[in-house]
Swiss-Prot record:
Primary gene name: asd
Its job: Catalyzes the NADPH-dependent formation of L-aspartate-semialdehyde (L-ASA) by the reductive dephosphorylation of L-aspartyl-4-phosphate.
Family annotation (PANTHER family): ASPARTATE-SEMIALDEHYDE DEHYDROGENASE, DEHYDROGENASE, PUTATIVE-RELATED
Name of protein: Aspartate-semialdehyde dehydrogenase
Reaction equations catalysed: L-aspartate 4-semialdehyde + phosphate + NADP(+) = 4-phospho-L-aspartate + NADPH + H(+)
Uses in industry and biotechnology: Vaccine strains for Salmonella typhimurium were successfully produced using strains with mutations in the asd gene.
Assembly mode: Homodimer.
Residues bound to NADP(+): 10-13, 37-38, 74, 166-167, 194, 351
Active site: residue positions: 136 (acyl-thioester intermediate), 275 (proton acceptor)
BP term (GO), one: 'de novo' L-methionine biosynthetic process
Gene3D superfamilies: Dihydrodipicolinate Reductase, domain 2, NAD(P)-binding Rossmann-like Domain
Modified-residue entries (S-cysteinyl cysteine), positions: 136
E.C. numbers: 1.2.1.11
């Protein structure tokens, strides 16, 4: 059995990872060691059937060097501090990371095994020891649209995202819900009075939204009842860093011989933990919609094709329907007026599952 260290297992992504590992009985195949950046020495958690003693110090290089595999959901600052020191010390173990820090390094592979198992296998055969989870929207796009990429049908992709609060973190989710609650509380009496005028209610809500009284420590501006058409840092070319990741990570995941252009706008909306994306896809040749649907549905067990039907779409292609599931549905598939090679698609996926924790879990399963 491999000795596997876990850092950041208490956080949001880490908690989802622990839950999935228990569900799949992954702990049966490893010797887990739990680390903490602040509470080492206290009792370690029990997942599965094995007691794991006490929490170890996440900054203790000697303790970390004793591990065969490290799985970290602790964030980029931790990776920046510990990873170089570990490698410089001669540690030859496997590093599995949820943070973006190492994604684009030449000696790292972005992991999404239903999409790039061939790349992962080649990396393992060539001694690669660093495996990093991808950007959530990129991973979810490839899970849903993987059939088109696998058959080399994609000329380019334009995307508009509808990204959930969870992409920012736990505090962002709390802030969104708090904003929602304050807006409701501000007009609760009027809403309970059928004779009240809805435009008066709207004016009160708008006034509170603009007043500066809503909590915005995390998002910077109100999200409830609104949206934020910018995610992550601003780059010199006018993109946000989130938008830059689309092309950079897609092509690295797929190990493409020539770059597939991917670009668009990334937008934060008031969903809790499911990212949605609207795509305009330029195909390399004309492909019928039934064939597109067959290719998408056959690519992996989680890519579910939703018929382009109003009622079915409203039931099945929403964050409310998909949250907490591993399904990555794709729908609104139709040809666009621009020409027979132009395809529309709409996808939804849980940002914390295939968007974050599940690729890490499955990579660990391969190594253990």
């Amino acid at each position: 059995m491999k000795n596997v260290g876990f850092i950041g297992w208490r956080g949001m992504v880490g908690s989802v990872l622990m839950q999935r590992m228990v569900e799949e009985r992954d702990f049966d195949a490893i010797r887990p060691v739990f680390f903490s950046t602040s509470q080492f020495g206290q009792a370690a958690p029990t997942f599965g059937d094995t007691s794991t003693g006490t929490l170890q110090d996440a900054f203790d290089l000697d303790a970390l060097k004793a591990l065969d595999i490290i799985v970290t959901c602790q964030g980029g600052d931790y990776t920046n501090e510990i990873y170089p020191k570990l490698r410089e010390s001669g540690w030859q173990g496997y590093w599995i990371d949820a943070a973006s820090t190492l994604r684009m390094k030449d000696d790292a592979i972005i992991i999404l095994d239903p999409v790039n198992q061939d790349v992962i296998t080649d990396g393992l055969n060539n001694g690669v020891k660093t495996f990093v989870g991808g950007n959530c929207t990129v991973s979810l796009m490839l899970m849903s649209l993987g059939g088109l990429f696998a058959h080399n049908l994609v000329d380019w992709v334009s995307v508009a995202t509808y990204q959930a609060a969870s992409g920012g973190g736990a505090r962002h989710m709390r802030e969104l819900l708090t904003q929602m609650g304050q807006l409701y509380g501000h007009v609760a009496d009027e809403l309970a009075t059928p004779s009240s005028a809805i435009l008066d209610i709207e004016r009160k809500v708008t006034a509170l939204t603009r007043s500066g009284e809503l909590p915005v420590d995390n998002f910077g501006v109100p999200l409830a009842g609104s949206l934020i058409p910018w995610i992550d840092k601003q780059l010199d070319n006018g993109q946000s860093r989130e938008e830059w990741k689309g092309q950079a990570e897609t092509n690295k995941i797929l190990n493409t011989a020539s770059v597939i252009p991917v670009d668009g706008l990334c937008v934060r909306v008031g969903a809790l933990r499911c990212h949605s994306q609207a795509f305009t896809i330029k195909l390399k040749k004309e492909v019928s919609i039934p064939t597109v649907e067959e290719l998408l549905a056959a690519h992996n067990p989680w890519a579910k094709v939703v018929p382009n039907d109003r009622d079915i779409t409203m039931r099945e292609l929403t964050p409310a329907a998909v949250t907490g599931t591993l399904t990555t549905p794709v729908g609104r598939l139709r040809k666009l007026n621009m020409g027979p090679e132009f395809l529309s698609a709409f996808t939804v996926g849980d940002q914390l599952l295939w968007g974050a924790a599940e690729p890490l879990r499955r990579m660990l399963r391969q190594l253990a």
